[in-house]
């Protein structure tokens, strides 16, 4: 190990951005073995022998060196979700774009600058193996004296000191959904049935949870009037899974339900897993819970009985704080909340239901005060099905969480170029297109990454690829509901690799403007150029045809993925490529040449 560190220090001088900074080295060994997070055993992925993987904590500006060893029987890569990767596109971890897969028995060294500060995560980006457990939390501690927005919460000096302490020492939490089927089995179920299956067995917190099978009567009582109407009288299953109807499958029915594996969609199996306990000390007065939403397909409502949540960071970006009683968390996003520890010391239930638009299911955990006593049942903010349980509660929804960044960050008022993406199903219920022109095949360019082939035919494929120039301001317009036979599109969560973007506008209907400037002039009420949200994951609406606009500046040349972070949608082709800054394509160091793996020669 000492030799490895020495070699890295010697060679870092010629890598962009790796000069005169602390170098931190980590080793992640990925294995495939039996495990039972919710009490039901299956094959799954472990990182350094644990699930989820170990928390990775760095200081802002650290130079990070991570040796990923693949001891699984199949290939993989690791993506560092939300990190900028300025000048290091070869470490973004996307097969076919920035690297070749890490084959069984081989390793790959990722090198990058720890920036920007905030809450992130790392996960697989090969096929759909996120379903198998390859993920972990990542936190970058901000530099000293960074302004924090806590005076918007309280003016008390005691509160402010406690909140600052809490933010510097957060508890990292990972919320995820879990299926008792491997990713291969799940995808085979989609293909064989020709149906879009989005059903899981449990909701986990820090890799712990269970399946509950509460009974048909309770499950049906939790359905909203909207969902009952959408189902047209069809019933949900005893797992809380939704029926195969036009509102869930589009025009691609009937499919072949008999090809769905037993227990994947119905016939609930009761688990015997254990739930997580989060311990807090009331003498600290406040705690920061930095939550990674590592789900593969579910949006989950997070709440702590009888406690308020002050959301102060979203997707790693500080925001003007918002007080909620529950927060709806979308796949791949990160939510940091401050919780005041002023209740009677005891155990309070953390509730983690699906938000009610894809399954009736819930997970649970315990929020436990040090020195607490038995206080009995605590009062919930939300129900098992994610519905409001109290007239006093207030929470965020699927698409209405659009906070202002802190401090204010403004994009340019105009852009240089815009691209329209039409998001919809692609010739089947379980395949998808991001661009509206093609579905992106899984691992299609895996062994010919576009980083090394920026002028190839694939890199000029306009059905999947856009090309920009350095310094341009770019608008990405995400349109849903544009297919005449499927006006009501499923909600999508779109992640942009590398730099964040501003959501500068959104509206209903079909985008039919010649420019964003024209749309903003005609409908100024639909746009925000003063303090728009600044994020790396964006949520489209499911309420009929609608559009939203992501704006960013090209400052980091490379091949970056734009994709839906529902894992089954990504596996079904919902992705595209942004070839940013093609006029200033990066020079690739020898350690990351086409057949290299990031290792330096030992000296």
UniProtKB/Swiss-Prot annotation:
State how activity varies with temperature. Optimum temperature is 50 degrees Celsius.
How is the protein put to use in biotechnology?
A: A mixture of dinapinones A1 and A2 at a ratio of 1:1 or 1:2 leads to inhibition of triacylglycerol accumulation in mammalian cells, suggesting that these compounds might be interresting to treat obesity. This inhibitory activity is mostly provided by dinapinone A2 but is potentiated by dinapinone A1. Dinapinones do not affect diacylglycerol acyltransferase (DGAT) activity but enhance neutral lipid degradation together with induction of autophagy.
Catalytic activity annotation: 4 monapinone A + O2 = 2 dinapinone A + 2 H2O; 4 monapinone E + O2 = 2 dinapinone E + 2 H2O
Amino acids binding Cu cation 1: 79
Positions of glycan attachment: 75, 155, 180, 235, 256, 272, 275, 388, 394, 413, 455, 512, 595
EC number(s) stated in the UniProt entry for this protein: 1.-.-.-
The entry's description of pH dependence is: Optimum pH is 4.0.
Which amino acids does the record list as binding Cu cation 2? 81, 123
* UniProt entry keywords in alphabetical sequence: Copper, Glycoprotein, Metal-binding, Oxidoreductase, Repeat, Signal
Q: Which PROSITE patterns match?
A: MULTICOPPER_OXIDASE1, MULTICOPPER_OXIDASE2
Q: Where is the Plastocyanin-like domain?
A: 30-144, 173-353, 450-581
Q: What does this protein do?
A: Multicopper oxidase; part of the gene cluster that mediates the biosynthesis of dinapinones DPA1 (or (M)-DPA) and DPA2 (or (P)-DPA), biaryl dihydronaphthopyranones that act in concert as inhibitors of triacylglycerol accumulation in mammalian cells. The first step in the pathway corresponds to the biosynthesis of dihydroxy-decanoyl-CoA by the fungal type I fatty acid synthase (formed by ORF4 and ORF5).
- Family that this chain belongs to: Belongs to the multicopper oxidase family.
Specify the protein name.
Multicopper oxidase MCE
